[in-house]
């Protein structure tokens, strides 16, 4: 039986940790644990229901974890469900009951180490990289048990679209990138070309009907090349010599967004070596299955710039095509032969040194799933028996998540710190602190243990790294990459907890460690006042002209975002209430510049574009909250007035808000189909309007929204999983499974205390 293991791994000599694996979440199949008939029936029903409704509800509800926790942490008291009719008033008592039902449930799915585990899947192109890398290295059967493979196949079949293809993400239309990689994954997992009740054949037909695998995106071309199912000559150049350029040049990889450079780093190593894995019978068969013409007849030079129209979110500018053609025809031949080959060898050596630095300083987790499996493959290419390769293997499990739709690869090793920091703020907002003190105490302990306590070793400039001492990461301290808004949300949560007696929530964080966190936040402000994600913006937006990833937008540099900027303002204002003299002038100046930046980037309709959540409701929540924290109000700030008008204009007939992920792609507000409301969008809009003083002007929109949230709550106190709510790089959606509980709790908590009780 499958079981979610939390904070385990101390007995494994190939696992490294800074804090005893706190926050680690791994699904493990234990054949000795059969499970009760009731549990097995619940699991099977959940799987069957998902498959039956997979084209209507494409998002899983994370039920396997919930079934496990319902047995381990049964809810002591399930209060009667509350409903509010259209003709009825929303009363404080009904809101309080709804909150207690929600908090009773949400506390029951908290892990023993204090965080809330959950699904952080969504993208369909992540797991194929893992499967291809394991297949090449010969480790597939050692790392993936038959049960792992079965669940991965379940996931791939469940998320195949009606037309036979697969999307970039679970809710997206079919793309060549998703379809080819998912098809290849099924074949490498042992599925025959005509298995899956015709599903594999339907996938192949979609690929061939849309031009074959030569039309896959550049990332897909790279994966097929290392597998041996595509030729390196059909790739645009990924020269590792970029790492030898002087840093003063704007195009140096060290100036790029860390996710971008950390993906192209191992790609450039593999390209520089022209590495190809073992040509197995399956690979030879794929050469026949994936193309519309015989493999030996393919024009690989022409294939370099081919891309299916379904995948083309960011078409290559002409300048880029000229650049790649020049490198391909004139520069690459020189670097592949002596004496130019000596420069190539030096570049490859530089690349692998940076790969090892990244591996060692993330305990072999790596910044994300794409570079995780690429780095692992590079370590194997360098030396199949290396310690580095062996240290990579057990960390693969950190990225795998199991739900009723099957096993997927997550977009990070989880969202542990991020979700926990938000959860604390949500619970505190309800003013039911004593009742849920044990929950807050565990979360408090977890947040303190997730802080990064040291900078990375060596010369940070040489390794292109920012300071990290005092920061909070998105997931775990073992991952360790510092992020501006994660650090800010960590500070905010701790400042709230510091106001509560320690007998209830435990001892607060040492002041010096808070000072370190504030130092990280201050260090991440750009000259224009905005805050990027991991590092300062190190180059220019025109670098996007050389963005080779047709599928993603705005990936080349670390841009400033409304979310990061707002979170920084909120953190610094909450901090200075308790420590008014610490770096007073720097903090004051930082907040003023940040507020000006936020006003400057507001869209003319009053909204802010959200880059990490769907989309304008998310961005506008941060916009309003940041400006209010900076001392602005509806009365003295036209930006807040315009933002409120924008949100009120988008309220649905049901009383809630419901925004489609299409907003992210099109950069125009798009309602969910049928003008449906969504509990998460509704909560974001409510929180925005409450902060902007809507209750004093006209509380009716808030009452309508609260009614929708109360009526949406499920019988057990949980809230429903609706459409996907996370996004990255403009075009790819990602799951935040905890949002469905955190934000309705937070919105109803604020509504109860600041609207109903205040009136």
Swiss-Prot record:
Catalytic activity: (S)-2,3-epoxysqualene = cycloartenol
Disulfide bridge positions per record: none
Tissue distribution of the protein: Ubiquitous.
Keyword annotations of the record: Isomerase, Repeat
UniProt function note: Oxidosqualene cyclase involved in the biosynthesis of cycloartenol.
GO biological process: tetracyclic triterpenoid biosynthetic process
PFTB repeat residue intervals: 149-190, 514-559, 591-631, 640-681, 702-743
Entries under PROSITE patterns matching the protein: TERPENE_SYNTHASES
Active site positions: 485
GO cellular component: lipid droplet
Record-given protein name: Cycloartenol synthase
A Pfam family the protein falls into: SQHop_cyclase_C
Top EC class of this enzyme: isomerase
EC numbers for this chain: 5.4.99.8
Cross-referenced InterPro entries: SQ_cyclase_C (IPR032696), SQ_cyclase_N (IPR032697), Squalene_cyclase (IPR018333), Terpene_synthase_CS (IPR002365), Terpenoid_cyclase/PrenylTrfase (IPR008930)
GO MF annotation, one: cycloartenol synthase activity
Family: Belongs to the terpene cyclase/mutase family.
Organism (species): Ricinus communis
């Amino acid at each position: 039986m499958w079981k979610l293991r939390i904070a385990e791994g101390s007995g494994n000599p190939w696992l490294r940790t800074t804090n005893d694996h706190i926050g680690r979440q791994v699904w493990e199949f234990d054949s000795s644990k059969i499970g009760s008939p009731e549990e097995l029936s619940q699991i099977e029903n959940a799987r069957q229901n998902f498959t039956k409704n997979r084209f209507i509800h494409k998002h899983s509800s994370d039920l396997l974890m919930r079934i496990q926790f319902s047995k381990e942490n049964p809810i002591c008291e399930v209060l009667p469900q509350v409903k509010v009719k259209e003709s009825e008033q929303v009363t404080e008592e009904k809101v309080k009951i709804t909150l207690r039902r929600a908090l009773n449930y949400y506390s029951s799915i908290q892990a023993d180490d204090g965080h809330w585990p959950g699904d952080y899947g969504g993208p369909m192109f992540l797991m194929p990289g893992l499967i291809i890398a394991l297949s090449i290295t010969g480790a597939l059967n050692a790392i993936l048990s038959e049960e792992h493979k079965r669940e991965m196949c379940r996931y791939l079949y469940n998320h195949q679209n009606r037309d036979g293809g697969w999307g970039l993400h679970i809710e997206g239309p079919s793309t060549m990138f998703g379809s080819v990689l998912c098809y290849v994954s099924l074949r490498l997992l042992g599925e025959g070309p005509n298995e899956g009740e015709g599903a594999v054949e339907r996938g192949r037909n979609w690929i061939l009907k849309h031009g074959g695998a030569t039309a896959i995106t550049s990332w897909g071309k790279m994966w097929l090349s290392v597998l041996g199912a595509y030729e390196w000559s059909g790739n645009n150049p990924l020269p590792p010599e970029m790492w030898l350029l002087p840093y003063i040049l704007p195009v140096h990889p060290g100036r790029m967004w860390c996710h971008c450079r950390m993906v192209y780093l191992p790609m450039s190593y593999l390209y520089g070596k022209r590495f190809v894995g073992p040509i197995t019978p399956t690979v030879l068969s794929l050469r026949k299955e994936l193309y519309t013409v015989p493999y030996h007849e393919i024009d690989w030079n022409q294939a370099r710039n081919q891309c299916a129209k379904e995948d083309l979110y960011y078409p290559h500018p002409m300048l880029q095509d000229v650049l790649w053609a020049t490198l391909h025809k004139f520069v690459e031949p020189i670097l592949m032969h002596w004496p130019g080959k000596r420069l190539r060898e030096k570049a490859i050596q530089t690349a692998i040194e940076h790969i090892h630095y990244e591996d060692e300083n993330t305990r072999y987790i790596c910044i994300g799933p794409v570079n995780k499996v690429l780095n692992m493959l590079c370590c194997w290419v360098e030396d199949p028996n290396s310690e580095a390769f062996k240290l990579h293997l057990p960390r693969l499990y950190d990225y795998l998540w199991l739900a009723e739709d099957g096993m997927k690869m997550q977009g990070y090793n989880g969202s542990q710190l991020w979700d926990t920091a938000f959860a604390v703020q949500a619970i505190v907002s309800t003013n039911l602190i004593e009742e849920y003190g044990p929950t807050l105490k565990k979360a408090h302990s977890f947040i303190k243990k997730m802080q990064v306590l040291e900078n990375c070793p060596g010369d940070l400039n040489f390794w292109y790294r920012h300071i990290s001492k005092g920061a909070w990461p998105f997931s775990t301290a073992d991952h360790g990459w510092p992020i501006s808004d994660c650090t800010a949300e960590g500070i905010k949560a701790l400042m709230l907890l510091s106001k509560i007696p320690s007998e209830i929530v435990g001892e607060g964080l040492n002041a010096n460690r808070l000072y370190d966190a504030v130092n990280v936040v201050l260090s991440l402000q750009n000259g224009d006042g905005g805050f990027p994600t991991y590092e300062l913006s190190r180059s220019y937006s025109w670098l996007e002209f050389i963005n080779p990833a047709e599928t993603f937008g705005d990936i080349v540099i670390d841009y400033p975002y409304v979310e990061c900027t707002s979170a920084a303002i909120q953190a610094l204002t909450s901090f200075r209430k308790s420590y008014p003299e610490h770096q007073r002038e720097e903090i004051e100046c930082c907040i003023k510049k940040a507020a000006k930046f936020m006003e400057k980037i507001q869209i003319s309709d009053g909204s802010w574009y959200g880059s990490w959540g769907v989309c304008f409701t998310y961005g506008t929540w941060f916009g309003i909250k940041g400006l209010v924290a900076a001392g602005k109000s509806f009365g003295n700030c036209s930006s807040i007035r315009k933002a409120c008008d924008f949100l009120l204009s988008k309220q649905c007939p049901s009383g809630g808000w419901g925004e489609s992920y299409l907003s992210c792609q099109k950069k125009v507000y798009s309602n969910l189909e049928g003008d449906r409301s969504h509990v998460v969008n509704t909560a974001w809009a409510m929180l925005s309007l409450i902060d902007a003083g809507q209750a004093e002007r006209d509380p009716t929109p808030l009452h309508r929204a609260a009614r929708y949230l109360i009526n949406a709550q499920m019988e057990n106190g949980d809230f429903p999983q609706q459409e996907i709510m996370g996004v990255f790089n403009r075009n790819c959606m990602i799951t935040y499974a905890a949002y469905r509980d955190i934000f309705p709790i937070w919105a109803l908590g604020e509504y109860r205390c600041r609207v109903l009780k205040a009136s």
